[in-house]
Amino acid sequence: MPMATTIDGTDYTNIMPSTVSTRVYLGCSIGIDTSTTGFTCFSWY
């Protein structure tokens, strides 16, 4: 079952259907706050 990630009202379900970690990484790289996912962007840098 695909996990729908909604950020700022945008559905990212079909953009990156791989892993949550990858979604968080991509989200941080474009400046999206991923604090709601339980991950922190600072851990990637």
From Swiss-Prot:
InterPro entries per UniProt: Corona_NS4
Result when mutating W44R: In strain: Isolate BCQ.1523, Isolate BCQ.3994 and Isolate BCQ.7373
The organism's place on the tree of life at top rank: Viruses
Effect upon mutating C28V: In strain: Isolate BCQ.571, Isolate BCQ.1523, Isolate BCQ.3994, Isolate BCQ.2590 and Isolate BCQ.7373
Stated consequence of mutating S18I: In strain: Isolate BCQ.571, Isolate BCQ.1523, Isolate BCQ.2590, Isolate BCQ.3994 and Isolate BCQ.7373
A Pfam family this chain is assigned to: Corona_NS4
Family to which the UniProt record says this protein belongs: Belongs to the coronaviruses ns4/ns4.8 protein family.
Protein name according to UniProt: Non-structural protein of 4.8 kDa
Protein species of origin: Bovine coronavirus (strain Quebec)
Taxonomic lineage: Viruses, Riboviria, Orthornavirae, Pisuviricota, Pisoniviricetes
